[in-house]
Amino acid sequence: MAKASNNSAAQRVRKKVKKNVAEGVVHVHASFNNTIITITDRQGNALAWATSGGQGFKGSRKSTPFAAQVAAESAGRVAMEYGVKNLEVRIKGPGPGRESAVRALHGLGIKITAISDVTPVPHNGCRPPKRRRI
C-alpha cells in the first residue's frame, strides 16, 4: 500500500517578514555596461536591488544615465516599503550612471546623509586591457 505523502510541508508558505529599517546604505556599482543598485541595512543585509538590464534596457541602452535613474527609483521604492528614510551612498566604478542614480534616490524623498566613492584603485596590480583604437 502506498504511503500517504505529507503535503502539509509543501503547502506551508513562508511569509516574508518585513523589518522596519530607518537607515540604510546604497551600493551603486556603475560599470561601462550596466548599473547595479543594492540597498542594504547597516549590517549589509540586502533590502532591495535593481539593475539597468532588469528594468527592460538591453544592449547599449543599459549603460545610459537614464537606465541607472530608473533602476535607482525601482530599488528606492522597494526600500521605502521597509521604512528607509536616510541613506548613505557608496559609489563604485567609472560608469555613466553614477550621478543620476543618486539624483533619482534624492528625488524620491529619501534623505542622502553621505556620499562616498569606494572605487577600487590598484597599487599597480593587474595589467589593464589594451587601449581601444576606433
From Swiss-Prot:
User: Where on the tree of life does the source sit, at the highest rank?
Assistant: Bacteria
Cross-referenced Gene3D superfamilies: Ribosomal protein S11
GO (cellular component) term, any one: ribosome
Gene Ontology molecular function: rRNA binding; structural constituent of ribosome
Against Pfam families, the record matches this protein to: Ribosomal_S11 (PF00411)
Look up the record and give one Gene Ontology term from the biological process aspect: translation
Which keywords are on file for this protein? Ribonucleoprotein, Ribosomal protein, RNA-binding, rRNA-binding
Record bears the keyword Ribonucleoprotein: yes
Q: Which parts of the chain are coiled coil?
A: none
Quaternary data: Part of the 30S ribosomal subunit. Interacts with proteins S7 and S18. Binds to IF-3.
Q: Which HAMAP family match?
A: Ribosomal_uS11
Family in the record: Belongs to the universal ribosomal protein uS11 family.
Main role? Answer: Located on the platform of the 30S subunit, it bridges several disparate RNA helices of the 16S rRNA. Forms part of the Shine-Dalgarno cleft in the 70S ribosome.
State what protein this is by name: Small ribosomal subunit protein uS11
* Gene designation per UniProt: rpsK
